[in-house]
């Protein structure tokens, strides 16, 4: 059975995590849910196509697919012989501190893009056969600025109502940096997706930067497709990760080595913070979080028992210098909605209609909806952005999204129409003024005046002025009357023998007068 083709969205995420976040192929494999071989394959294709992350990010899905197709064809035509590693060099490099077979295999695969290389297990077995006695260690090592581990503590803290009864049990979120053990904690009402993402945002602001990886304890609130080996992030979770330019690697179930750091951190918070608060009464979440923040500050400045310094000093020395900068804006939780663009180049989001470029009419797009804004995405790229409106049945339209003819129509204001009428002649100006002030709705007057413009293009301004003068004299200054006069050629005949007094519209409640438009 053929391997299903990977989506362009997932391929872009591979390239972002590799080039923008600097993750290894195995870390990317776990984060996205594809094999390490597939990661290596697509990274090699992108390199052969001469791409970098800046170029790939700017491309639409179709452009990226077309760019990579030739590279994929060339890669498939390479020799089927596998590249043998240099076993002597492997044996020598393994003596260096921190170097593992995992790292050496990744370097071996990356050094031979587009070539057939050994999978990780084959690589290890062949080296073992050569060296006869090699043992691999699973010892956890955390580089500075690499990982922020996160989980919720087990015990909860009661928050009381004004009558002294328990209003709700607050849950305590804990985050720990891998290298320095610098710790953050805060309380939330629940453990929903909004609580998880909001607490992670608070943690990132607390440390003042962004690590390479976020490692939560595989929470259902963040994971759309639970899987022991290839968990899939939810759409909103992935959007949050993209906003901060990082990656998320949920800990595997029943794999304590994946989350040992945060489990120790949770235990310390329970003993150092929650145990000290057990006799206090809290009547709001803000009051509880203030008390937690004070104790966390003390915890981070508390000296280590077996090492020199404290968490704060280690953070300033190790993690802080290498953290990536925070984005300008804090992440705002977004929901996503698939939409089809209507024939009028607007999409329906919550009963309000937002414009997109008219070329996308009848196509499918995604709406990214936040509390304050609506973004429209097509082919992985943003094509429109609007302030969110709660007005049902109304339209929000950007002029640049409109066809040229529609845009020209919108640019004709009452003042501009009157100026145009005056440029034709006093008769045309009088007819335009009548049309603008005597139609039941302004839009009807605009359309009638635009009809006069089309008559000027067809018959010329001189004939239009003569027709307007005749329409005024017969007491019928309408577009239809002017058209009839022109079609019958009456404007070419001598003017009527008598000149009636200036025509005036009868007084009635629909008459606005020129001041209505100023």
Swiss-Prot record:
Residue span(s) of domain HTH IS408-type: 11-94
Taxonomic source organism: Burkholderia multivorans (strain ATCC 17616 / 249)
Known role: Required for the transposition of the insertion element.
PROSITE patterns recorded: HTH_IS408, INTEGRASE
Domain Integrase catalytic: 140-335
Residues covered by region (Disordered): 496-518
Basic and acidic residues composition bias: residue spans: 504-518
Organismal lineage: Bacteria, Pseudomonadati, Pseudomonadota, Betaproteobacteria, Burkholderiales
DNA-binding in keyword set: yes
DNA-binding region: 23-44
Protein name, UniProt field: Putative transposase for insertion sequence IS408
